[in-house]
Regions:
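N-terminal Rossmann NAD(P)H-binding glycine-rich loop of SDR-like oxidoreductase domains
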Residues: 9-13, 17
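Residue(s) in the substrate-gating loop at a strand-loop-helix junction
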Residues: 125
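Substrate-binding pocket helix/loop in short-chain dehydrogenase/reductase
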Residues: 81-82, 89-91
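Active-site helix of classical SDR
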Residues: 105, 141-144
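SDR active-site lid
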Residues: 158-180
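The beta1-alpha1 cofactor-binding region of Rossmann-like NAD(H)/NADP(H)-dependent oxidoreductases
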Residues: 45-55, 87
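A short, exposed helix-loop element centered on a Lys and neighboring polar residues
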Residues: 105-106, 150
Length: 180
C-alpha cells in the first residue's frame, strides 16, 4: 500500500511511518523538517500551505500512481486559559489542526475517488469530546476536525473511501514541548 503520514518529524507520526515502512508499505512522510529514515521517504511540506500540499501529492502520484491511506497526524497543542489566548495563537492552532488536515483530505480525494478505494485516518484527541481546562482551544480544534470527518464520512462512502478520527489520550511526545 501507498501510505501518506503527516507530522513525521517526531513522535506518533515518525513511529507510524517507520512501522509501516518496516512492514513493506511505501510510506511518504510529510513534515516541515526533512527527516532521514531507511523506512520512509520524507517530502518537506507545510500542510498549512495548500500549494505545498498539492505539490507533495503530485510528486507521490508521479511515482506511485495511487494513494491508499492518509494518516493526518500533524498537529500542535495550546495551553492557557481561554481568556488569555491570543487571536494569533488561536488562528495558528486551527490553521494546522483543522485547515491543514482538511487540505490534505481534499488533496487525496480525487485519486481515492478515481480508484474507488481509500482510508483517511485523522489523529484527534479525547480532548475533542469535552472542553479540557486550560486546553479549550485545542479541544475546540480537534472537535471541529471530528465534525468535518463525520460529515465527510457520509460524503465519500459511495466511492469506498473510509474516513475516521482516532481519539488518543495524552501520549509523551514532543507536542507537549511545542504547545503555544
Amino acid at each position: 500500500m501507498t501510505i501518506i503520514i503527516t507530522g513525521t518529524s517526531t513522535g506518533i507520526g515518525f513511529t507510524l511511518a517507520e512501522y509501516f515502512g518496516k512492514k513493506g508499505h511505501k510510506v511518504f512522510g510529510l513534515s516541515r523538517k526533512n527527516v532521514e529514515s531507511q523506512y520512509f521517504t520524507t517530502i518537506p511540506t507545510d500542510i498549512t500551505d495548500n500549494t505545498q500540499v498539492q505539490a507533495a501529492i503530485s510528486e507521490i502520484l508521479k511515482t506511485e500512481n495511487r494513494i491508499d491511506v492518509l494518516i493526518n497526524n500533524a498537529g500542535m497543542g495550546m495551553v492557557g486559559a481561554v481568556e488569555d489566548s491570543t487571536k494569533e495563537d488561536i488562528l495558528k492552532l486551527f490553521n494546522l489542526n483543522l485547515v491543514g488536515a482538511v487540505q490534505m483530505m481534499s488533496a487525496v480525494m480525487p485519486n481515492m475517488r478515481e480508484q474507488k478505494f481509500g482510508k483517511i485516518i485523522n489523529v484527534s484527541s479525547i480532548g475533542s469530546e469535552m472542553g479540557l481546562p486550560f486546553r479549550g482551544f485545542y479541544s475546540a480544534s480537534k472537535s471541529a476536525l471530528d465534525k468535518v470527518v463525520e460529515a465527510m464520512r457520509y460524503e465519500v462512502y459511495q466511492w469506498n473511501v473510509e474516513v475516521c478520527s482516532l481519539h488518543l489520550g495524552d501520549i509523551k511526545t514532543k507536542i507537549a514541548e511545542n504547545r503555544v
